[in-house]
Structure formats: C-alpha cells, structure tokens
C-alpha cells in the first residue's frame, strides 16, 4: 500500500548493482518472488476456470462482483508477502509495487461491478441510486471515489488514524482546557485564566486551539477515508456543533434515502435541494473571503466538504489522494446538476473539474511526476472502467512483451506478467474479441507456464497448470478441470495432453468417476452429467476398458431402477459402450496382459495386476453382467412385441422416430448377426408400427398369422430368458457375495437383485398369459418347471408368480 502513496520511484528492475550485499538481496527477492508468482498463478487459474464455466455469470451477460472481490483477496495476500522481502533490494521494491497495484486494480473493479446491484433496491425512490444504476459515467466516477476512500482509509489507519480517533473519543469537549482553567480557584490576578473561554467563537487557550486543529485534521482524514458520519458524530460529541452540522450535510450525500428521486414538500426534497445549493454557494464565498488561509486545518476541511478542487490537489501527496480530490468534486457536481436546484453555469463555476472518469484519469496521467508503476495503475483502471479493451491489450503487450521466464535479469517483473496475463484472460473469457496484442500476452503467459512445468503445449491448459500444484493437490485439481469439460472433443484433447505430460490419465479418470458416484449418492449430479463424465473412461483405451464397462453397468442399473424407466437412455448407454468397442478392448487387454483399472469397491486399488485371479474375476464378471443387462433389454423388447400382438397389458414407452432412424428403421437387415442386440428392437419397432396401422385402419391381422408370429418370437425369447436367468453376471450370489474382508458388494448385489425382482416376474407372468392365449400351457409348464424354482428371485416374488399362475389355472408344480 505504501508505494502507491509515494511520490517518486527508486526501482529499476535490474541486477547491475556491483555491491555484493545488494546482489544477494536481489537474488533472495527474486527467489521468493518466484514462489509468490507460482502460487499466484495457481490461484488466478482457479478463478479463471470458475469464470469460464459460469460460476460468476449473472443476468444480462455480466460478471459477478464476487470474482473481483476474490481476486482482491488473493492479491492482498501476495502484497502482504512482498512486504517481507529483503529491504534495500530493487527487485523487492518492484515486486511490492506490482502487488500493490494488483490489489488496487481488483479493488476498484470489485467496487465498480457491485455498485449497480447494491443500489438497485432503492432506484425507484432515490436520485443517487438512479444515477448509480442508470448513469454509467456517474457510476464510474462514484467507483473512483469509493475506491480512493477505501485506499486512503487503509493507508491512514496504518499511520495511526485509529489512535487519533480514539484519543478524541476520550475527550469530553474541544474546550476541555478552558473548562479546567475556569474550574480552578483564582486568588489573584496572576492566577486568573487569561484566554480561557467556553464560547466556541472565542480563540480559547493555546491547548484548546491545538486540540481543535488536531480534530480538524482528523475530520479531514475521516472524510477522505469515507467516514464522514463518524467525523460528524465525533465533532458533535466534542461540542463543535457548526462543523458537525456541515459534516452531517456532507454525509447525507451518501445515503440514498436522503437524496429523493422526486422532490416534494412531503419528503422535504425541495427544501433539501435548494438549501444544499445555497450552502455550497455560501461556502464558496466564505472560502474566497478567507484570504489565502487554505492551509489552515479548518479551511482545508471546509474545502473538502465543498469539493474545492485546488486545495485538495495541493493536499494530495499521492495519486490516489488526487483521484479522491477529482472524484469528490465530480460526484458533488453531478449530484447537484441532477437535483436541478443550481444552474449548470453556476455548477461549472463552483466545480471546475473533469466530469468523466476518463478525463479525470487522463488529467492525472498527464502529470510528469507520476512513476511508471502508478501510470500502469491509472491506465489499466481507465481501460477497464471504460471498456477500452483493445488499449488494455496493447498496453499489456507493451509492458510485459519482453518477459523472459526464469531470468533474474529480465526487466519485466514476473508479478506484472501475472496481472496482465490474467486481465487479458478475463477479457477473453468475458466475451471480448481477441487481437494480436492480447494473444501475444496470452502466449507469454503460457511460455512462462511451460518453462515451469516442462513438456506440454500451451494449448492444453490443464497440463500446464497441473505442474504448478503441490503433489497432493495435483490429482484433485486435474479431476476438477476434467469435470468442467463438457464436449467429447475437448475431453479427448485434454486426455491426450495429460498423457503427454506424464500424468496418469487412467487414475485421474477413475478418481473423477468415483467422485461422480459420491455426488450421485447426494443427488448433486444428474444422470446426463454422469453419462457425459463416463466418456473419460471410454477414451482411455485398454487401461480403462474394465472401469468403463463397470461404470456402464452401473449406469444401466441406475436407469433400470429409476421411476419411470427411460428405456431409450439404457439403449443409449449400451450403444455408446459398443461404439467404443469396450468389450473388445477388454478382451485385448486380457490377451496382451495389460494393466487394467477397476472401479469395483472391494478394498483394492484401481490398478489390477495383469493376469491376477482378482483381475480376471473382475473382468469376467463385468463382461457377464454387461451381457446380462443387454439380455434384459432384448428379452424386454420381445415381451413388448408379444404383448402387442396378443393384446396383453405390458407397460412400455414407444420408440421415438429419432431412435428408429438411428437403428436403420424397422426393416430386417441383411447383415444382421447373432450379436446384433438391436435386432430385437427392430422386431419390437415393427410390432409398434403394425399396431398403429391397425388402429388407423381399424382392422387387425388374421389370427393364425398373428399366432404364428408370436410362436416364432417365443421360440427366440425362451432360450434368451433361460440364459438370462442363469447368467452368473446378474446372479448376486456369485461374484457379488460377501467376502473375507467384509461385504463391499452389498449395494451392487442389492441393485442386481432389485432388477431381477422387477423384470423377471413381469416376463414370466406375460409368458404365462401368452401360453393361455395360445393354448400352449404344456410347453410353458415344462419351461417353467425346468428351473426347479431357482429363478434367483426373492421368495415373495416366487409366491406372487405362482399365485398368478393359479388364477390362470396353470399348474406349475
């Protein structure tokens, strides 16, 4: 903070000092600034990701002030760290200056972006709020005023303003010395009080005068610190009523309700406006009659209240204090102009100041005594407030264009690169058009990242930034980055970059899916998002083939157990697994004895040793379960087909035209194979189409034809159903049974059992109804009894099925 209040510059950013001690300090400062730079880069990256993925999005395409507030906090931490750099080092001074400026840039932008939201609630009743919300130029100047007050406040309190305020709060009156003198007994002329007086217009004792001067100085600093109300209360408590009243008048200009939108006698708006106008005119006459006493503490205070620019500029020893001088006067002028109680000519005479933020900052930038660092601050704020992003890009490139990573003799401080790289990146992420200057800065930033992280291309951001993270944070941060990617193309690019950077992509992908599963338990992630994230495993090749198939099975189980069941999503998941040839990849992994990763939560690590029995067991079960779940879909399709042709009740959702087009329509395909699981869907689709046509024509197909077709379907589906019932991949008592290390498969086993209980009773009941309708109960009886009551169902469902059969007069014992 202190550097921004200095009037000169003593840094050169060079290491040409011949003095060994100075060189050692510069070396140390460079070393520690590199650490600050690395940590700052990581934090800024997180904020940029949050911005890019919409965390800071608010209506009307704006960015939440929260982003700038968080950046202010980050920069403040770095600024505090730079204060600990070795004193007397040029690089220390340079680092602290840039850290200071980063704090102030974030501060003014956080204030500016928040103003419209803060004043929105009173915009219908307050002129001040209306100006803030609807007049963007007023909002910019007001932001400069509030920012400069905040910065001055921090600086003044560091210098002991708080102690001075507390001292005044402990004094009963500004005439305390007169009071004490008048209380003393007087026994002679020599002891009589000379200048003691309780009259506020009388000079009072020298001690009184010194106390009042100190109070005026404190009030002045409180005004510039944005604490006029505190100054007013303090003045009144000290018995300085006249000053207190004027301070109260000034403080009212910050209260939206004290500046009503519509002036009337009811809200005293007319009186307030006219008297405020007269007050400023009267005060100006008094200042003119003071005959050059502007340096007096009282007149300095009055000039601050009045917005008299020249004394305030003279009192301003730093750029921020001069910003306050201009902004204070400009805000007063704009408010008085909006109130309309004073002519524009009178306002121009009273407040001969620039009335736009750009003109104010241009005025300050034109002063020759400003240092390069302060010039950077003013120009960046000017560009950002006025959306002159092209100039920001140009200036950024001019300032950091010569940066060389890891070069202690580089004339560009690495913290300057952090500031401009992030400002340009934020502008890009906010929708501003890139240009050559902006791109040059982005490339410089990525060159720096590559120099510290090694191998990866700057186009693959995640790989670069992961190099800066502590080892224990690397995997979680990569996983969070992977979560934010929402397109298949981006996933493949990022996956390739992670692999090229020697990062264990398979472990990252498995960790991501583990977190998604946990999020699923707490209902904070949608099914669609889970399917999208599953793509990370699908593109991992043989290494993640087992994990991909396990996650595929979990997603299918999840949809099967949802209410209502979305059959199309189940088919979508299976198609995706087959499109990426997951079963084939898994078979190749076994043949190649490749290391595979598993998500089965049995207490083992992700990585499975090639050829180990546990790995083989997991692969076999995942494959059997996958084909078992596909069999549920196939059998269900045939059951729906049979129900439609026999007019039996069976719950289903019609196939959409889009999905029908995806599978090639309802016609039989010449190249259909035994492994074509879509064949059953086309059979069902033809049945649905036939039913719709019959409804439209109001004519059913000939009975014998229909019976013959159903019989063909039964001949096909019964072997499939037998295989499904006996498939140990969907029999929970096999691979999913409790183990020596506990019962890690309990949830998985429960889901499989629930699926069996849900689907198999429906299948057997429909088959029984079909057997009765076809008068073929004998064959059905043989089929059912061949299972010896071992359908892998809970006992209650076996009882339910047999009870239903009894109602149909089917004997199955």
Curated annotation (Swiss-Prot):
Keyword Membrane: yes
Pfam families xref list: Nup84_Nup100
Compartments, record wording: Nucleus, Nuclear pore complex; Chromosome, Centromere, Kinetochore; Nucleus membrane
Keywords assigned by UniProt, alphabetized: Cell cycle, Cell division, Centromere, Chromosome, Chromosome partition, Kinetochore, Membrane, Mitosis, mRNA transport, Nuclear pore complex, Nucleus, Protein transport, Translocation, Transport
InterPro entries: Nup84/Nup107
Stretches that traverse the bilayer: none
Protein's job: Involved in kinetochore assembly and chromosome segregation during embryonic mitosis. Required for the localization of the NDC80 complex member him-10, the chromosomal passenger complex component air-2 and nuclear pore complex proteins npp-23 and npp-15 to kinetochores during metaphase. Required for npp-23 localization to the nuclear envelope during interphase. Recruits mdf-1, a component of the spindle assembly checkpoint, to the nuclear envelope. Appears dispensable for the assembly of the nuclear pore complex and for nuclear protein import.
Source organism superkingdom: Eukaryota
A GO MF label: structural constituent of nuclear pore
Biological classification of the source: Eukaryota, Metazoa, Ecdysozoa, Nematoda, Chromadorea
Main location: nucleus
The protein's name: Nuclear pore complex protein 5
Native source species: Caenorhabditis elegans
């Amino acid at each position: 903070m202190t550097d921004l209040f200095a009037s000169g510059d003593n840094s050169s950013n060079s290491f040409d000092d011949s003095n060994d001690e100075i060189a050692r300090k510069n070396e140390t400062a460079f070393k520690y600034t590199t650490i600050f730079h690395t940590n700052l880069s990581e934090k800024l990256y997180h904020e940029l990701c949050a911005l890019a993925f919409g965390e800071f999005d608010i209506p009307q395409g704006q960015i939440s002030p929260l982003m700038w507030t968080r950046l202010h906090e980050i920069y403040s931490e770095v600024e505090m760290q730079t204060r600990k750099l070795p004193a007397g080092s040029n690089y220390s001074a340079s680092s602290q200056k840039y850290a200071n400026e980063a704090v102030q840039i974030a501060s003014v932008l956080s204030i500016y972006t928040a103003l419209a939201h803060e004043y929105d609630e009173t915009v219908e009743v307050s002129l001040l709020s209306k100006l803030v919300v609807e007049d963007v130029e007023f909002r910019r100047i007001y932001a400069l005023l509030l920012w400069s007050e905040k910065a001055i406040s921090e600086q003044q309190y560091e210098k002991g303003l708080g102690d001075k305020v507390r001292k005044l709060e402990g004094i009963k009156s500004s005439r305390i010395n007169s009071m004490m003198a008048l209380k003393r007994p007087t026994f002679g002329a020599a002891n009589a009080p000379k200048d003691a007086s309780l009259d506020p217009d009388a000079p009072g004792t020298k001690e009184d005068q010194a106390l009042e001067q100190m109070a005026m100085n404190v009030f002045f600093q409180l005004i510039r610190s944005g604490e006029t109300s505190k100054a007013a209360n303090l003045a009144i408590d000290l018995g300085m009523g006249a000053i207190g009243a004027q301070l109260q008048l000034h403080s009212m200009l910050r209260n939206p309700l004290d500046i009503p939108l519509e002036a009337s006698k009811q809200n005293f708006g007319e009186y307030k406006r006219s008297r405020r106008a007269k007050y400023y005119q009267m005060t100006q006459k008094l200042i003119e009659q003071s005959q050059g006493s502007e340096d007096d503490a009282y007149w300095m205070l009055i000039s601050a209240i009045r917005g008299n620019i020249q004394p305030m500029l003279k009192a301003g020893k730093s750029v921020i204090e001069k910003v306050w001088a201009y902004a204070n006067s400009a805000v007063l002028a704009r408010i008085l102009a909006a109130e309309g109680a004073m002519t524009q000519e009178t306002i121009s005479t009273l407040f001969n100041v620039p009335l736009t933020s750009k003109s104010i900052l241009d005025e300050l930038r034109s002063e020759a005594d400003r240092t390069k660092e302060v010039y950077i601050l003013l120009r960046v704020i000017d560009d950002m407030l006025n959306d002159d992003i092209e100039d920001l890009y140009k200036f950024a490139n001019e300032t950091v264009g010569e940066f060389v990573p890891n070069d202690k003799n580089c004339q560009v401080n690495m913290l300057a690169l952090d500031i401009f790289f992030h400002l340009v990146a934020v502008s890009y992420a906010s929708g501003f058009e890139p240009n050559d200057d902006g791109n040059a800065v982005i490339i410089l930033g990525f060159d720096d990242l590559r120099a510290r992280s090694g191998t990866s291309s700057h186009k693959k951001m995640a790989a670069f930034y992961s190099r800066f993270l502590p080892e224990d944070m690397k995997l979680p941060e990569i996983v969070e980055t992977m979560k934010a990617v929402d397109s298949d193309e981006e996933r493949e690019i990022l996956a390739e970059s992670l692999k090229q950077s020697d990062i264990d992509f398979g472990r990252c992908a498995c960790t991501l899916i583990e977190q998604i599963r946990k999020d699923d338990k707490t209902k904070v992630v949608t099914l669609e998002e889970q399917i999208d994230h599953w793509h990370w495993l699908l593109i991992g090749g043989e290494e993640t083939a087992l994990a991909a198939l396990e996650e595929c099975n979990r997603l299918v189980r999840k949809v099967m157990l949802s209410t209502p069941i979305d059959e199309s999503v189940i088919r979508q998941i299976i198609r995706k697994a087959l499109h990426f040839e997951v079963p084939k990849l898994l078979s190749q992994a076994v043949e190649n004895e490749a290391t595979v990763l598993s998500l089965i939560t049995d207490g083992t690590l992700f990585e499975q040793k090639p050829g180990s029995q546990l790995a083989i067991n997991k692969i076999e079960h995942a494959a059997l379960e996958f084909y078992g779940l596909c069999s549920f879909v196939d059998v269900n399709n045939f059951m729906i087909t049979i129900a439609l042709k026999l007019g039996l009740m069976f719950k289903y959702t019609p196939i959409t035209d889009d999905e029908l087009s995806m599978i090639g329509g309802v016609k039989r395909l010449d190249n259909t194979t035994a492994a074509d699981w879509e064949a059953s869907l086309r059979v069902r689709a033809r049945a649905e189409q036939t039913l719709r046509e019959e409804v439209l024509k109001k004519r059913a197909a000939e009975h014998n034809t229909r019976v013959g077709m159903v019989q063909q379907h039964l001949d096909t589906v019964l072997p499939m159903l037998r295989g499904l019932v006996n498939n140990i991949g969907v029999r929970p008592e096999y691979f999913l049974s409790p183990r020596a290390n506990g019962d890690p498969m309990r949830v998985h086993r429960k889901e499989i059992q629930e699926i069996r209980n849900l689907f198999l009773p429906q299948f057997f009941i429909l088959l029984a109804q079909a057997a009765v309708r076809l008068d073929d109960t004998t064959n059905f009886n043989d089929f059912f009894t061949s299972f010896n009551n071992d359908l892998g169902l809970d006992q209650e469902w076996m009882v339910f099925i047999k009870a239903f059969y009894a109602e149909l007069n089917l004997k199955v014992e």
